[in-house]
Amino acid sequence: MFRTAVRNYSSRVGQKFQSLEQIKEYLKKPTWDTKTLLKGSQKSLEIDTPKLHRLLQLSGLSTDLDAGKERQLLNDLNAQLTMMNKLQEIECKEFDLIETQHSPLKFQDIRNATGELRQSSKKGETGQWNPLDLASVKSEGFYVVNEKLGKE
């Protein structure tokens, strides 16, 4: 009286790979290019020479550049801005934060770890060093300086 309808769905994109070499050959061919992302649709934010010099000053770098180096920096910065604009245009409604696999570090864990450290002669850690042993004149655990500090 009741009939159960079962239908198997299948689809094909291409032929099945016959060997590992075919798979490797397929994976060698790029399917997309990052240069397509760098083609700017927006030119509203563009780095010009005064902005470049200001960025160099803020970074503590020299602003004395030859024309070729300056042009290269401008092209690189504009490409980065274009890429950032493209990334910001992507709408991301859902995202999941990746859970961390570790527990938070506690002060007691740090104390325990430092308590287990041993000195290594390979690193030049040879034991206790008392700088007062090197002083020719000392008094009550302090260096004694016999020079005048001011100019005469």
From Swiss-Prot:
It is found in: Mitochondrion inner membrane. GO terms for biological process: glutaminyl-tRNAGln biosynthesis via transamidation; mitochondrial translation. GO terms for cellular component: glutamyl-tRNA(Gln) amidotransferase complex; mitochondrial inner membrane. It is a peripheral membrane protein. Its main location: mitochondrion. The keyword Protein biosynthesis applies. This protein may be expected to contain an N-terminal transit peptide but none has been predicted. Allows the formation of correctly charged Gln-tRNA(Gln) through the transamidation of misacylated Glu-tRNA(Gln) in the mitochondria. The reaction takes place in the presence of glutamine and ATP through an activated gamma-phospho-Glu-tRNA(Gln). Required for proper protein synthesis within the mitochondrion. Belongs to the GatF family. HAMAP family: GatF. This is Glutamyl-tRNA(Gln) amidotransferase subunit F, mitochondrial. The gene is GTF1.
